[in-house]
Design a protein with these regions (language model features):
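C-terminal ends of transmembrane helices
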Residues: 3, 54-65, 106-119, 168-178, ...
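Intrinsically disordered, low-complexity non-transmembrane regions of multi-pass membrane transporters
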Residues: 1-11, 205-220, 255-259, 269, ...
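Hydrophobic, membrane-embedded alpha-helices of multi-pass small-molecule transporters
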Residues: 6-19, 155-167, 184-185, 200, ...
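Short, non-helical or kinked segments that cap or interrupt transmembrane helices
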Residues: 43, 65-78, 119-128, 181-187, ...
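Membrane helical hairpin/interfacial module
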Residues: 39, 47, 57-116
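The first (N-terminal) embedded transmembrane alpha-helix
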Residues: 12-29, 73-80
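Membrane-embedded helical hairpins/re-entrant loop segments and their flanking transmembrane helices
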Residues: 5, 31-67, 236-306, 429-433
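Membrane-embedded alpha-helical modules
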Residues: 87-204, 313, 318-426
């Protein structure tokens, strides 16, 4: 049965709502951490929403060069939050976008053969990395629950009550609602929390009234990018981790749509993601990855048509052209965001643990990979000054929990699993050769 335009439009809006909270939280966290003005923050949210639409269309409108052609929605990756904040603090905003541009180019280059590197990123690595991502983001959530780091009312009871009300709403909706309402429970929690905060005197609409009605998208809004080795390496690691995450989403959607993905399909998907990251750097947005929450919505609705996602991409681009829509997101109090972040980042941790559950922990090597990578990732997050005496080129790699933990997981996997398999294969070949000789 064919979908009418009205139904396709409504389904497209559902996908926008399902990913909207995750899409706006990243620019809000990053923008506030880097001390952007209200005008700059409004632009950052606007361009991010716009580029989410562009990135989505690059993937769904498949051609011979790029695009996986599945009903996939792309959004800014949470993996990049901590590294972007660290790069911005150490090198400035120009280096942030220089590193994003460089990582986008890297993804495009490795897209031709990344599928062959899967042995370097098994579940023991990806599960550890995703778990570390959630853990290292949790301090951001806790600071926001208290009112925002450095705020005059940090830790006040009103902020904590507001944050826990939002968290409670999300938990209750997850428990008692079904279908689409359940899929947008975080967005509903943020909206209700902001409504309550208004009556507590914590919401001001000046930013909305001051915002322009329409805004043209422009490249290099924050100035020309600069390129430094350490930020580029850091963001390249983030991009590769995002590719691994996206691969899981691609295969999940392939199963849902009864489509067997080939290596060529994956390469085109990676290439589209690389283009999205490159454009994100040029237009001062973010790195992009496939959003898993929209996979759940495809499963819930049973509608697997690419036309729905095309509509989603167009809606996102349209939203990005109207700053007043973005300005509404800047009025959300930090405590409200903090309550929602606990749920979102906690879900990231839970998803990482779920990925780790598929591992054979009877092998001591896997236990050690998880132990060392998660341990170092958490340790560096709690004590960021531990590697302060190292050269400045290395500190960005060692003082970020996500990067430190990811590098540890990849190296240990190579040592314990990749090399050991190669040695085992070589021994078997020698044994066969000896038997043949006899």
């Amino acid at each position: 049965m064919k979908n009418g335009f009205g139904k396709t439009l409504s389904l497209g809006i559902q996908h926008v709502l399902a990913m909207y909270a995750g899409a706006i939280v990243v620019p809000l966290i990053v923008g506030k951490a880097m001390g952007l003005t209200v005008e700059q923050l409004t632009y950052l949210v606007s361009i991010d929403i716009f580029m989410c639409g562009v990135a989505t269309l690059l993937q769904v409108l498949s051609n011979r060069f790029f695009g996986i052609g599945l009903p996939v929605v792309l959004g800014c990756t949470f993996t990049a939050v901590s590294p972007i904040i660290a790069i911005g603090a150490e090198y400035g905003v120009s280096a942030v976008y220089g590193s994003i541009i460089a990582s986008g180019i890297l993804v495009i280059l490795i897209s031709f053969f990344f599928g062959k590197l899967a042995s370097f990123f098994p579940p023991v690595v990806t599960g550890s990395v995703v778990t570390i991502i959630g853990i290292t983001l949790m301090p951001v959530a806790m600071n926001n629950m208290a009112g925002g780091e450095g705020s005059a009312d940090f830790g006040e009871l009103s902020n904590l009550v507001l944050a826990f009300v939002v968290l409670s709403i999300i938990v209750l909706l997850y428990r008692f609602s079904k279908g689409f309402i359940k899929s947008i429970s975080i967005l509903i929690g943020i909206l209700i929390g902001t409504f309550i905060a208004y009556f507590m005197g914590k919401v001001q609409f000046d930013n909305v009234s001051d915002a322009a009605a329409v805004q043209m998208i422009q490249p290099f809004y924050f100035g020309m990018p600069s390129f430094h080795a350490a930020p580029i390496i850091t963001m390249s690691i983030v991009a590769i981790v995002s590719l691994v995450e996206s691969t899981g989403v691609y295969f999940a959607l392939g199963d849902l749509t009864n489509r067997r993905l080939t290596e060529k399909d994956l390469s085109k998907g990676y290439r589209a993601e690389g283009l999205a990251v490159l454009l994100g750097g040029i237009f001062n947005a973010f790195p992009y990855t496939a959003f898993s929450q929209n996979v759940g919505l495809v499963q819930l609705t049973g509608i697997k048509k690419n036309a729905v996602i095309v509509v989603t991409g167009i809606i996102l681009m349209a939203f990005g052209l109207f700053p007043k829509i973005a300005a509404f997101t800047t009025i959300i109090p930090s405590a409200v965001l903090g309550g929602a972040m606990v749920a979102m980042f906690g879900m990231v941790i839970a998803y990482g643990i779920k990925m780790l559950s598929r591992i054979d922990f009877a092998k001591q090597e896997n236990l050690l990979i998880v132990a060392c990578s998660v341990g170092l990732g958490l340790g560096v997050t709690v004590v960021p000054d531990i590697f302060k005496q190292l050269p400045s080129a290395l500190t960005l790699l060692t003082t970020n929990g996500i990067v430190a933990g990811s590098i540890t997981a990849v190296i240990l996997n190579i040592v314990y699993n990749v090399f050991s398999r190669a040695e085992k294969t070589e021994r078997n070949a020698d044994a066969i050769e000896q038997k043949t000789a006899v």
